[in-house]
Design a protein with these regions (language model features):
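N-terminal organellar targeting/addr​essing segments, predominantly mitochondrial targeting sequences
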Residues: 1-34, 161-165, 171-177
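Single-pass hydrophobic alpha-helical transmembrane segments typical
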Residues: 17-73
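Beta-strand elements of modular eukaryotic interaction domains
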Residues: 39, 77-80, 113-114
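Mature, function-bearing regions of proteins
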Residues: 58, 67-86, 105-106, 125
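Beta-sheet entry/capping signal
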Residues: 87-89, 141
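Short loop/turn segments at strand-loop or loop-helix junctions that form parts
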Residues: 90-95
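Non-transmembrane interaction and regulatory regions of membrane-associated proteins
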Residues: 97-115, 121-480
Length: 480
């Protein structure tokens, strides 16, 4: 007798066929049921985040394509063989508190330009990029200039303006290897297209540095100065490398057989060795008759006054930029990750303003551009001047001991120790060069932070009234 009662349920032909395939009957008898509570929570949360992420990226692509369709007809205009495309100069500065100095440039490339293939051009400080939508749709080229440290961008802008002024006044030759009418015409056309292209400034820090460089470039004289040489002359009289005075209790008999110590008058000036350093050139006795050619030639740009008015300047595209740095801002970082469409729309609108070429006069209220971004600076940035002064104090506190060791070894007053043989201490010449490099770095950091700190207002000159322009929103019916 069969111990198992027959299954009263009637089997369908499909089920019978599946049983003959070798599938266990227990699998076929299993009925679907809801997952456990924990699995339901996990699946719900995961699918919610995935769905929101997919929706955000879909909207981002849709927004970008919308603005590309608005301007792509501009690329259909014919361009002559000797013409240049419209060129935009993009300025980006280091975000205070972030060691990554290129964040602003990457923000511009990702949201305003969407560039994917960088090409180096003009050294490590300047980069050109092959454009993708929206600018390539409008046949616009661009160049990014980024400052690696605070103040680099202001110095770059000021030096570029001074170079243009010197060339315009005939103090320097134009940057042409073989001047010709054709080359001159091409240069003028390129300069005109660059002026028409405009200038994009990314973020509050870059805006402050750009305006500071603009003021320095148009108000300072055109004298060419070697910054290292100027700083070396300033450091000559600080006394850190002066020879200590001879002790009055030391008799001359004790120095009869010893190597004479150099007096301060016999020492070379306190300056680092260089191409024209007195440490590398022989010292000549002074001539009893002054030579008329001994005095250095005066730079003709020293006496050039600043212009009474400014020439037309490229219109400014002010691009808001906030870089979230720090653990306290992690919630905002997460929110931005799932709401990237807002950045995409802001970048597309900024590019749309530039492409449309609709500008308005610069107003005083524009000086408050992106002022709210300064509230996201790390609190530690307020101690930058204190940190610089602390590093300077510690360095000069340890300098006398290093200098005494270098002089004692160079004069043979004592034998080097085992550690000094394995790792020779720096010589006096190396200490001078190191001090010059550190002082240049400290002073540049102090000036740079002073130009971008939240307490510092944006530079302004009354001569800029009516000269500077800002790209504005175009009329809505223009592109419809």
């Amino acid at each position: 007798m069969n111990a198992f009662p027959p299954d009263p349920r009637k089997k369908s032909g499909f089920r019978t066929a599946l049983e003959f395939t070798g599938i266990p009957p227990s699998w076929l008898d299993k009925r679907p049921r809801l997952p456990s509570r924990n699995w339901l929570i996990f699946l719900s949360v995961t699918q919610t985040f995935i769905g929101y992420y997919a929706y955000d990226r879909h909207q981002s692509r849709k927004i970008r394509q919308e603005y590309v369709d608005r301007v792509k007809h501009l690329a259909e205009d014919p361009l002559q063989s000797l013409d240049f495309p419209r060129t935009v100069t993009v300025y980006s500065a280091k975000w205070p508190g972030d060691d990554d100095w290129d964040r602003g440039s990457r923000y511009f490339r990702k949201y305003v330009k969407v560039c994917r293939s960088p090409l180096s051009q003009g050294g490590p400080f300047t980069h050109s990029f092959l454009a993708q939508p929206i600018f390539v749709a409008a046949a616009i080229d661009y160049t990014v200039i980024a400052g690696k440290r605070h103040g680099d961008l202001a110095t770059r802008v000021a030096n570029d303006i001074k170079t243009e002024r010197r060339v315009a006044l005939g103090l320097d030759p134009p940057p042409l290897s073989a001047p010709s009418l054709l080359a001159k015409g091409m240069t003028e056309a390129k300069r005109r297209r660059k002026h028409e292209g405009g200038t994009a400034v990314v973020g509050r820090a870059a805006f402050k540095e750009y305006m500071a460089g603009l003021r320095r470039g148009w108000t300072e004289n055109l004298e060419r100065l070697d910054e290292d040489e100027k700083l070396s002359r300033e450091l000559e009289g600080d006394g850190h490398f002066d020879e200590p005075e001879l002790s009055p209790g030391l008799s001359s008999d004790s120095l009869a057989d010893a190597e004479p110590l150099p007096t301060p008058s016999r020492l070379p000036p306190s300056r680092p060795p260089g191409i024209y350093s007195p440490l590398s050139t022989p010292i000549r006795p002074p001539s009893p008759f002054p030579s008329p050619t001994a005095a250095p030639a005066r730079d003709p740009g020293t006496d050039v006054p600043p212009p009474a008015y400014l020439p037309p300047q490229p219109a400014l595209l002010l691009v808001p930029f906030v870089n979230l740095v720090g653990i306290k801002l992690v919630p905002l970082m997460i929110w931005e990750f799932f709401n990237e469409r807002y950045k995409v729309r802001a970048g597309a609108e900024a590019a749309y303003k530039l492409v449309s070429c609709v500008a308005r006069p610069f107003e005083r209220t524009d000086l408050d551009f992106d002022a709210s971004a300064e509230g996201y600076y790390k609190p530690s940035t307020a101690s930058i001047p204190t940190d610089v002064q602390k590093a300077r104090t510690e360095y000069y506190k340890a300098l006398p001991e290093k200098l005494a060791t270098a002089r004692a070894l160079s004069r043979g007053e004592r034998e080097p120790t085992k550690l000094e043989i394995e790792a020779p201490p720096p010589t006096e010449v190396e200490l001078r060069a190191e001090r010059l490099k550190k002082e240049a770095r400290w002073r540049a950091d102090e000036r740079g932070w002073e130009s971008v700190c939240p307490d510092k207002p944006v530079e302004w000159d009354d001569r800029w009234e009516g000269v500077l322009e800002v790209f504005a929103d175009p009329p809505t019916e223009r592109w419809q």
